[in-house]
Amino acid sequence: MATIELHAWYRQYRKLKEEAADAILLFRFGDFYETFDDDAKLIAELLDITLTRKEYAVDKRLPKDQQKLYAPMAGMPYHAVDRYVSELIARGYRVAIAEQLSETEAMRNDTRPRSVYAAGLTPVESSGKMVQRAIVRVITPGTVIDPAMLPDRTNNYLAAVIVEQGKVGLAYADLSTGEFAAAEFTDARALMQLQAELARLSPAEVLVPDDEALRLPNLEPVQARLSQDLAPLTKEEREALLPHERVARRLEGASAASWTQGYVTEWPLWRWELATTTEVLCEHLALPSLAVCGLDGRPLATRAAGALLQYAQVTQRQRVSQLRALRVYHTGAYMLLDPQTRRNLELLESGGRQGAKASLIAVLDRTCTAMGARLLRRWITQPLIVIEPLQVRQHAVARLVAETMARLEVRSALADLPDMERALNRIAQGITVATPRDMTQLRAALRKLPAVAQAVQALLPDLLAAEMPGEPPLVFDVCADVLDLLERALDDDPPALLGSSNYLRAAEEGGERPRRVIRPGFDQRLDALIRASRHAQEFIDRLESKERERTGIRSLKVGYNQVFGYYIEISRAVDAKLIPAHYERKQTLVNAERYVTEELKYYEGLLSDARLKLVDLERDIFQRLCDELQPHLDRLRATIAAVARIDALAALAEVAVRGRYVQPRLRTDRVLRIKQGRHPVVERTLSEPFIGNDIDLDGEQAQILIITGPNMAGKSTFLRQVALITLMAQIGSFVPADEAEIGLVDRIFTRIGAQDDIATGQSTFMVEMTETAALLMQSTPRSLIILDEVGRGTSTYDGMAIARAVVEYIHDHPRLGCRTLFATHYHELIALERELPRVRNYHMAAVERDGRVVFLHELRPGGADRSYGIHVAELAGIPPEVIRRASALLADLEGQRPPSSPAQPPAPPAPVVVPAQETGQGMQLSFFDLAPHPVVEYLRRLRIEELTPLEALNRLAELQRLAGQG
């Protein structure tokens, strides 16, 4: 005989918890989502929620006053759950939602007065009958679909990656928008392509097989990445951390070499089997074979796509009908951008304090809709390298630039257009996901579409033209029939959630009509039920005045609470003789008595029955409405794609007009010619006019520009400016310049700045050399290379030798010959112009006025003659005594050697063997003995302009220390 009796609800909770052992389980209890046991302790700490307790069992072995057992409990109101779940997901947790399967069934089982449901309240557990619950979805970082939990203007991708014998299968999807795509990489660049794609997508979650042979060290799951951290713990301590704490610590344990910042999840190997994934995809997409969608002959892409689809189905607990079409793509039509280049060019995020505000997308994103913003973001992160689609896009932007009124009108029509893409995808999943709010947003968007179409009617053929060969043009269908259906079905201002309507109360005179989901007249059954039941509500509404008049008790009032339902309240000061005999006492208060009557209970029952039926009927009608929209989903998605493109194109046109951008001429050769180009981001932040600069590169005469000049003169800005103008041209945008001719590039490589990678034990110089090696190995003649101060992380001569060798390799190697900008402080490299025919010298100009340096920010032909390092040190706030001493040393050193001309740079000095002075302390060098001495000769040969600012400061500090000793 069991001595511990678990309550029925707790047995149900334990069973559901076993289904979602690796997730926090939110268990619906009436108006709250509750958590219990370890989950409760966790969220109480994480979310600052009060930790309480709830009786879950009786232990009859204990004394009677100690038999009740309590479980820790913490919960949140159902209407605020999105905020709490968002925070948990952001911390890396998985959240399982256990809902009551049938609200009306729960109502029927509830022992409270049935009148509580007339006010729209949800049920609680009864002691006799248990409400059935089930996990309706598991929310993970990559499967979020609720708009309240997602950023409006960015995608939330779930990705799946499988690697086998150097070949890669990749699939990704956004469950909130319905985007679903797959690719397979099989050549020698497969891993490089995967890394670039993961950098582009920035998935919130990446699925990998639970077999180490089929995944990369760069994509280790959480458990593997934390194994080292957990190893020192005892078994009990490790178990105490699982399953939640290991997830919370995922970022601490994540490998710095990981190719994604998203959550990495293991998915069982059998889910990746080719036979399984093929069957799942064909069944879901209703295809006779995978050849129809382009997956035939791509087994790894098939396995990745099928595994992802199964994961989505399992977490959503249903068919993910929003994933209706799979796009198989090839990276050959797009520019691959590695993570370093994306970071260096600050496409989506700046490394500075301004973050996204100082990025390229902050300049270009003038879209009016969330759909357009997401599309423009994809364009920026995936530039085209084929001229035909670029010309189509560029021509559309040009039309909108020229047609001012059309551009202004369409942007006005698009303003405040709801995110119909995400709303439609929730509707596609039916009543388990869709809400009246989604229907309302779709209706509001459809109402605005005729104005959008009218504004650009004459331009639609250009705006919606097919970009890729073989693709049909986009179609703009205002879907008037769908709008008509929604107008007839939905009330003017429906509540956000089902079950919140009040159908039984008529509009008060001069007041607003109560909110309801379904419009009167749409469904005859609903209207008939409302008419038949409304007199019960009207009776209760009139009861107070009726009873006052009948009894003569002026203080009598009719009230309601959740415990007792409707009641008649009479002050205890009233003479008991005035109280009718048929009044049944229900509750005694300090100053009043509460009563019910048979008549009141009868009408209260009618009202409760009506509420039950109305909730069921409303859900049925809403599901029917979702079903009626299913045949129109493809039309609506096509219209959404058209709206997104029009919005993105209009945004680029608006930026072009406001920024005085020009239409670049696109070419297929290696010309890169820009006249008075400007940095699009820096220009926007300056209060004074930006100083433009020219560049003229090609593969025949001027392939490599060596750019010298002082720090702060604008070299790095110019390098990024050229790369950004090129990238902008290859998304179809106009560019910030007076004129531009852009020979399309297949890749942009940047080596700008570096820092120690402490987590992987790599120094600044190692990081720099690794990145340089990658670009030298991966570049092609059509690439654009941007190099800034290669070799600065090591000794002067080592760095100079490496820098020169890199330039020679790019110039001479038959596989390369690509356009290159090479900024350097090694002035000796300007001699390469005489030795290599396709090298040209340029410098960022600066002049000295009244002892102060003025940076002109102008790119001029020829090499620089000075670095102005001491002036930069002064601007940085170096103490005046250090600046004075450095100036004296520089003057002395410059006086000991003949001046050099930029046109005739001296060869690097030969190494000097410096003998040691044998002292009791070992070898000691004298830096300040001005008598002829090998150390002095060494100093005379030292060239200050060759030093980076950091190296110069280190030398100065050492000199100052030695001077103080002497």
UniProtKB/Swiss-Prot annotation:
<dbReference type="InterPro" id="IPR005748">
    <property type="entry name" value="DNA_mismatch_repair_MutS"/>
</dbReference>
<dbReference type="Pfam" id="PF01624">
    <property type="entry name" value="MutS_I"/>
</dbReference>
<feature type="compositionally biased region" description="Pro residues">
    <location>
        <begin position="899"/>
        <end position="912"/>
    </location>
</feature>
<dbReference type="InterPro" id="IPR027417">
    <property type="entry name" value="P-loop_NTPase"/>
</dbReference>
<dbReference type="Pfam" id="PF05192">
    <property type="entry name" value="MutS_III"/>
</dbReference>
<dbReference type="InterPro" id="IPR007861">
    <property type="entry name" value="DNA_mismatch_repair_MutS_clamp"/>
</dbReference>
<dbReference type="GO" id="GO:0005829">
    <property type="term" value="C:cytosol"/>
</dbReference>
<dbReference type="InterPro" id="IPR036187">
    <property type="entry name" value="DNA_mismatch_repair_MutS_sf"/>
</dbReference>
<dbReference type="InterPro" id="IPR017261">
    <property type="entry name" value="DNA_mismatch_repair_MutS/MSH"/>
</dbReference>
<dbReference type="GO" id="GO:0006298">
    <property type="term" value="P:mismatch repair"/>
</dbReference>
<comment type="function">
    <text>This protein is involved in the repair of mismatches in DNA. It is possible that it carries out the mismatch recognition step. This protein has a weak ATPase activity.</text>
</comment>
<dbReference type="InterPro" id="IPR007695">
    <property type="entry name" value="DNA_mismatch_repair_MutS-lik_N"/>
</dbReference>
<dbReference type="InterPro" id="IPR000432">
    <property type="entry name" value="DNA_mismatch_repair_MutS_C"/>
</dbReference>
<dbReference type="Pfam" id="PF05190">
    <property type="entry name" value="MutS_IV"/>
</dbReference>
<keyword id="KW-0227">DNA damage</keyword>
<dbReference type="InterPro" id="IPR045076">
    <property type="entry name" value="MutS"/>
</dbReference>
<dbReference type="GO" id="GO:0003684">
    <property type="term" value="F:damaged DNA binding"/>
</dbReference>
<dbReference type="InterPro" id="IPR007860">
    <property type="entry name" value="DNA_mmatch_repair_MutS_con_dom"/>
</dbReference>
<keyword id="KW-0067">ATP-binding</keyword>
<dbReference type="InterPro" id="IPR016151">
    <property type="entry name" value="DNA_mismatch_repair_MutS_N"/>
</dbReference>
<protein>
    <recommendedName>
        <fullName>DNA mismatch repair protein MutS</fullName>
    </recommendedName>
</protein>
<dbReference type="GO" id="GO:0140664">
    <property type="term" value="F:ATP-dependent DNA damage sensor activity"/>
</dbReference>
<dbReference type="Pfam" id="PF00488">
    <property type="entry name" value="MutS_V"/>
</dbReference>
<keyword id="KW-0547">Nucleotide-binding</keyword>
<comment type="similarity">
    <text>Belongs to the DNA mismatch repair MutS family.</text>
</comment>
<dbReference type="GO" id="GO:0005524">
    <property type="term" value="F:ATP binding"/>
</dbReference>
<dbReference type="Pfam" id="PF05188">
    <property type="entry name" value="MutS_II"/>
</dbReference>
<dbReference type="InterPro" id="IPR036678">
    <property type="entry name" value="MutS_con_dom_sf"/>
</dbReference>
<feature type="binding site">
    <location>
        <begin position="709"/>
        <end position="716"/>
    </location>
    <ligand>
        <name>ATP</name>
    </ligand>
</feature>
<keyword id="KW-0234">DNA repair</keyword>
<feature type="region of interest" description="Disordered">
    <location>
        <begin position="894"/>
        <end position="914"/>
    </location>
</feature>
<keyword id="KW-0238">DNA-binding</keyword>
<dbReference type="GO" id="GO:0030983">
    <property type="term" value="F:mismatched DNA binding"/>
</dbReference>
<dbReference type="InterPro" id="IPR007696">
    <property type="entry name" value="DNA_mismatch_repair_MutS_core"/>
</dbReference>
